[in-house]
């Protein structure tokens, strides 16, 4: 042989992988089309294959180039990595690894580092390289200078296969981008796009941590979709699933015949509820693998952030386990110290490599410091889903309006802990599946009450401190639960009620983005003040939102079927307060009967209360009103045109 049998890969290249410090493992392991020097023929091109299988007796690459009979790979000395270079093998080649375990049994495995895979139910890895030329430099530059906590964020959560069934990444780049732009969201969040064999898992049982699912096209097609979103001014968040992985015998589990990526002890290495394996976060190579996966989606696909799934299951050794089914940590506690260290590392590393990105935790417990910086003892996430707010709000919404007065405190409780973390308010896919019903079917009453209540609820949500996330279909009141195998119910999207709700979402996003009072101080107590937190008898909530420059918006939501036509309120400033939103507007399929003629006027109180003012406001039944203080405006005279 007159050339390097490992295609230029050496043991030195793998030291970072073994120490846990290599966060770009995809550049070394897996398959790569490379050109190397042959002593006799000069440069030759082929594919380098490399796979970590330290406990294997033998490893072969099987492929369509060798009629699936196998080419033996050799162990790179001292590395636990098997490699080979095969001349003439190019992009598009299908391959797998055949691994002989310690007991002599052969196992066919897909490449853990595959960057492209066959479409399910087939599962071979595919040799690929990217040829995409990005056109989002301006977007990336703005992102690097951004301050996410003090900027607007309204997120549209999308399952690509269920948005419009059958569309490719490139087709979605036209239709999805156009729709999200019209609706006015700042970001989309994609449910997992890493390769997964079982469609009803929605992508949460990953077998290809570096491989975009081929259901919708090639990796470069996904790059095209993300690029188009960026060019339209829309950020992209991707779901990432480092908490567990499936037991498919051709994937990561028992990869070389031993527990390589997972813990060997099922008390540490298996999720009984989900029937999946748990990563061994304390193993350096596993840490390198996972951190590389996270970095890969941001570096190679220009994702603007990751939403990390099921963080609570990672943090606790006794998560969903009975006594005796888990192993305490070295201090005798229930915290998974290795997972905590891993999460801190991945957050620190990604923020240092890509300033301005978003790291978001789906964390359902009260674990302290999820969004505190690592240097201050926190986990280092930028945001955390506010699951408490979500549960309390939906439970309240499902009540008969008469009974809501007895649960008023559940809606105000979120402000008790609002500033303990940086929150996103999520009404995600999890709330419209598994028999929970769609959002509209959760609400008691007839069509009018249901649509009015939804309009009121989402306006309440958009004005509450925290960023917003809604799952696709909610914006027009889809009536059935989410089903990944069919499209959303677009045929109802423009009917009465549905169309009004869709237009409301468009205006919520527009008004929200135009008014820093609604987002600039989400994580700062200066940005919120109750007007009345205790009006349980009227099911009415009212507060002020403020920005850094003192601009102020008064927000009112009435979850009762009774209008409040002369609702007396105290306000911090006298003068004109302009109505900028009324969910009872005819534009939103409301009645158009309950409004404030475009404004209210707050009169100063006599001494000693000169620092405050008093006014009356009309709040529609099952409705919301937002009023923005307008110090330069003069009160409209009777007969002046106004809007209800």
Swiss-Prot record:
Record-linked Pfam families: Alpha-amylase, Alpha-amylase_C, CBM_48
**PANTHER family, alphabetized:** 1,4-ALPHA-GLUCAN-BRANCHING ENZYME (PTHR43651:SF3)
Q: Which Gene3D superfamilies match?
A: Glycosidases, Golgi alpha-mannosidase II, Immunoglobulins
Q: What does the function comment of this entry state?
A: Catalyzes the formation of the alpha-1,6-glucosidic linkages in glycogen by scission of a 1,4-alpha-linked oligosaccharide from growing alpha-1,4-glucan chains and the subsequent attachment of the oligosaccharide to the alpha-1,6 position.
Top enzyme class:
transferase
| Gene name as annotated | glgB
Q: Could you tell me which species this protein originates from?
A: Cutibacterium acnes (strain DSM 16379 / KPA171202) (Propionibacterium acnes)
Q: Which GO terms describe its molecular function?
A: 1,4-alpha-glucan branching enzyme activity; cation binding; hydrolase activity, hydrolyzing O-glycosyl compounds
State which pathway it belongs to: Glycan biosynthesis; glycogen biosynthesis
Q: How does it assemble?
A: Monomer.
Recorded catalytic reaction(s): these are: Transfers a segment of a (1->4)-alpha-D-glucan chain to a primary hydroxy group in a similar glucan chain
Superkingdom of origin organism: Bacteria
State the Gene Ontology BP annotations: glycogen biosynthetic process
Keywords tagged on the record: Carbohydrate metabolism, Glycogen biosynthesis, Glycogen metabolism, Glycosyltransferase, Transferase
Under what name is this protein listed?
A: 1,4-alpha-glucan branching enzyme GlgB
Its EC number is 2.4.1.18
GO cellular-component term (any) = cytosol
The active site lies at 309 (nucleophile), 362 (proton donor)
Family label: Belongs to the glycosyl hydrolase 13 family. GlgB subfamily.
């Amino acid at each position: 042989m007159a050339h390097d049998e490992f295609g230029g890969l050496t043991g030195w290249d793998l030291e970072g992988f073994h120490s846990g410090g290599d966060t770009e493992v995809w550049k070394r392991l897996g398959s790569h089309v490379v050109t190397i020097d042959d002593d006799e023929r000069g440069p030759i091109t082929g594919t380098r294959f490399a796979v970590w299988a330290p406990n294997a007796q033998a490893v072969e690459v099987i492929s369509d180039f060798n009629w699936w009979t196998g080419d033996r790979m050799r162990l790179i000395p001292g590395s636990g990595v098997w490699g080979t270079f095969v001349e003439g093998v190019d992009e598009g080649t299908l391959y797998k690894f055949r691994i002989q375990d310690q007991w002599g049994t052969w196992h066919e495995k897909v490449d853990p580092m595959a960057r492209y895979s066959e479409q399910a139910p087939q599962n071979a890895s595919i040799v690929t390289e990217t040829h995409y030329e990005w056109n989002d430099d301006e977007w990336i530059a703005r992102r690097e200078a951004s301050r996410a906590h003090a900027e607007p964020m309204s997120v549209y959560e999308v399952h690509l296969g269920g948005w419009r069934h059958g569309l490719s990444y490139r087709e979605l780049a036209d239709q999805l981008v156009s729709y999200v732009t019209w609706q006015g969201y700042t970001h989309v969040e994609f449910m997992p796009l890493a390769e997964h064999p079982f469609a009803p898992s929605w992508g949460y049982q990953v077998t290809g941590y570096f491989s975009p699912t081929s259901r919708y096209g090639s990796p470069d097609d996904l790059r095209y979709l993300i690029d188009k979103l960026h060019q339209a001014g829309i950020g992209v968040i991707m779901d990432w699933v480092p908490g567990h992985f499936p037991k498919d015998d051709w994937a990561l589990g028992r990869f070389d015949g031993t527990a390589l990526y997972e813990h060997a002890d099922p008390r540490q290495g298996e999720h009984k509820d989900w029937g999946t394996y748990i990563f061994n976060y304390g193993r350096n190579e596993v840490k390198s693998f996972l951190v590389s996966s996270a970095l890969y989606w941001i570096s190679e696909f220009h994702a603007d952030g990751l939403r990390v799934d099921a963080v609570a299951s990672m943090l606790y050794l006794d998560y969903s386990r009975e006594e005796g089914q888990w192993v305490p940590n070295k201090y005798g506690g229930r915290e998974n110290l290795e997972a905590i260290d891993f999460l801190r590392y991945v957050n620190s590393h990604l923020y240092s490599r890509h300033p301005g990105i978003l790291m978001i935790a789906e964390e359902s417990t009260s674990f302290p410091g999820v969004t505190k910086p690592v240097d201050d003892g926190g986990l280092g996430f930028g945001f955390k889903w506010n699951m408490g707010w979500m549960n309390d709000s939906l439970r309240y919404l499902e009540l008969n309006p008469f009974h809501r007065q007895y649960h008023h405190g559940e809606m105000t409780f979120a402000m008790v802990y609002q500033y303990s973390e940086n929150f996103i308010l999520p009404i995600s896919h999890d709330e419209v599946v598994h028999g929970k019903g769609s959002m509209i079917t959760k609400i008691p009453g007839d069509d009018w009450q249901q649509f009015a209540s939804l309009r009121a609820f989402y306006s309440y949500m958009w004005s509450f401190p925290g960023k917003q996330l809604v799952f696709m279909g909610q914006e027009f009141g889809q009536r059935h639960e989410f089903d990944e195998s069919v499209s959303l119910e677009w045929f109802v999207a423009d009917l009465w009620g549905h169309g009004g709700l869709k237009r409301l979402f468009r205006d919520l996003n527009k008004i929200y983005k135009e008014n820093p009072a609604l987002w600039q101080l989400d994580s700062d107590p200066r940005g919120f003040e109750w007007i009345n937190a205790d009006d349980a008898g009227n099911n009415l909530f009212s507060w002020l939102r403020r920005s850094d420059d003192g601009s102020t918006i008064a927000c009112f939501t009435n979850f009762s079927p009774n209008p409040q036509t002369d609702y007396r309120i105290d306000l911090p400033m006298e003068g004109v307060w302009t109505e900028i939103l009324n969910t009872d507007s005819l534009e939103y399929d409301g009645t158009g009967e309950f409004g404030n003629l475009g404004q209210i006027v707050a009169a100063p109180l006599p001494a000693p209360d000169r620092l405050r003012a008093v006014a009356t406001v009309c709040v529609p039944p099952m409705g919301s009103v937002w009023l923005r203080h307008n110090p330069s405006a003069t009160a409209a005279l009777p007969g002046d045109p106004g809007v209800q």
